[in-house]
Amino acid sequence: MSELTTIARPYAKAAFEFAVEHKAVDQWLGMLGFAAQVAENETIHNLVHGSVAAEELANLFVGVCGEQLDEHGQNLIRVMAENGRLGVLPAVLAEFVAFKAELDKEVQADVISAIELTDQQKANIQASLEKRLARKVKLNCSMDASLMAGVLIKAGDLVIDGSVRGKLDRMADALQS
């Protein structure tokens, strides 16, 4: 676990629990998404990592976000500014999204193939993963010719390497040991 994730997780968890309790998960997702974009803005990024006073920085940040943040979202920004943590807002968003996916029983699966997959192949992979993981699966498909043939699937902690490159690497390891 990276240091950024360690710092971001408590803020994301608190925001998520508040959002669930108040049935406002999608609203909070929007607020955090906007705040994370603001935090990534080069000018704001320089101020966040500069020597601006926490209260002044929080007021500036809330001012930039305007009506995109409700009162509770503004409070989160103020707490994060007081603790010098506004720079981790993108990581807070990522953790919040992970908590939401867990609540929705969803998982993002990266499917890397040597060639473009047909819609039928994508549907078959998605159905198989949904059955195996007992979750709704969203596929993120990409191509990598270095795999030679086959697919590499990553879904959470699960990695399925059905590529020729992976098989060759495993054979090479077996021969060397």
Curated annotation (Swiss-Prot):
GO terms for cellular component: plasma membrane; proton-transporting ATP synthase complex. It comes from Aeromonas salmonicida (strain A449). InterPro entries: ATP_synth_OSCP/delta_N_sf, ATPase_OSCP/d_CS, ATPase_OSCP/dsu. Belongs to the ATPase delta chain family. The keyword Cell inner membrane applies. It is found in: Cell inner membrane. F(1)F(0) ATP synthase produces ATP from ADP in the presence of a proton or sodium gradient. F-type ATPases consist of two structural domains, F(1) containing the extramembraneous catalytic core and F(0) containing the membrane proton channel, linked together by a central stalk and a peripheral stalk. During catalysis, ATP synthesis in the catalytic domain of F(1) is coupled via a rotary mechanism of the central stalk subunits to proton translocation. This protein is part of the stalk that links CF(0) to CF(1). It either transmits conformational changes from CF(0) to CF(1) or is implicated in proton conduction. F-type ATPases have 2 components, F(1) - the catalytic core - and F(0) - the membrane proton channel. F(1) has five subunits: alpha(3), beta(3), gamma(1), delta(1), epsilon(1). F(0) has three main subunits: a(1), b(2) and c(10-14). The alpha and beta chains form an alternating ring which encloses part of the gamma chain. F(1) is attached to F(0) by a central stalk formed by the gamma and epsilon chains, while a peripheral stalk is formed by the delta and b chains. This is ATP synthase subunit delta. It comes from the Bacteria. Transmembrane segments: none annotated. Keywords: ATP synthesis, Cell inner membrane, Cell membrane, CF(1), Hydrogen ion transport, Ion transport, Membrane, Transport. One of its GO terms (molecular function) is proton-transporting ATP synthase activity, rotational mechanism.
